[in-house]
Amino acid sequence: MKLADCPVFPAEAANALSTDRGLGWRLARQAGPVLRHPATNGMFANFVFAVGREEVLANLDDARLDRARALPESDLQVHQQLFAPKSAHDLAAQFRPTAAALIDRFAAAGGGDAVADVTTPMADALFDSVSRLQLLPVEHLNGRSGHVLSEACRNLFKHAGWHLLELACNPELCDVLRRQPELIREFIEEILRLEPMVPSCQRFTTQPTTIGEVELPADVVLNLCIGAVQRDGSDPMSTDDLVIGVRAHRHWTLGAGSMRCQGGHIVRQVLRVLVEEWVDRAGHIELAPGFRPAVAFPTTQSVLWLPELPLVTRA
């Protein structure tokens, strides 16, 4: 099939993704395993979306496809200490008092906007913790590496809003996690699966390539929609439901193979601190009446995040 004959990403799917990822991705998968952007000119005219499981997973680490890297390989050598598992533990310990203080202040105020009051300042606090622990050389922290790290911290805590949303909507879950903290790890993995930090991983064709029987020319931006795969119902572990107490569901939110997120240890340790402190200090906080969480489905691989999260003390 030629790209021009490929079905487009349905408008109803894109609209649904803003409030219901399960419905949105289901509508996209029903339209076909490979979809093109509806734009016929401009920067999005060469965007293609793979939403089928086989089409996504087969190409996450395909050497034939180019991918954008935030930093060159030579710079990544400097980050070995930062990405070490021990550093993630040290960073989480350094970050915990700040997280506890922010959550305490939020709870004492009776709530507010958790994005503005909790998760956004946490991003700066995490960056400062990296600096205090000297996990990156000063010249790199003040250069390109520091810029990338700062953006990564912001993206991590944009994603953290989904954890707080689920906890605010489900007081019984808060109680379970408080009584059984060993389940917090599974809870974190489930939110990572259901609300991936980046819903699609971008790859770039450098030569004519066939994906899911669709012939793609060179210079196509291929969006591998892991968000669609992780909810596709192909097995009992890939559903729209949050399930804990069985075992962690497999997901590709943090990449795969050579494209696996090297900061994965940090992501998990920091999110664990956030959830532990929240269920201990703010389990009585709930979603503000009448608020309906909505996001804008990104046309690039930008983070899908909640711009606001108004919470109040449970009556």
Task: Map each language-model feature to its residues.
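Cytochrome P450
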Residues: 1-315
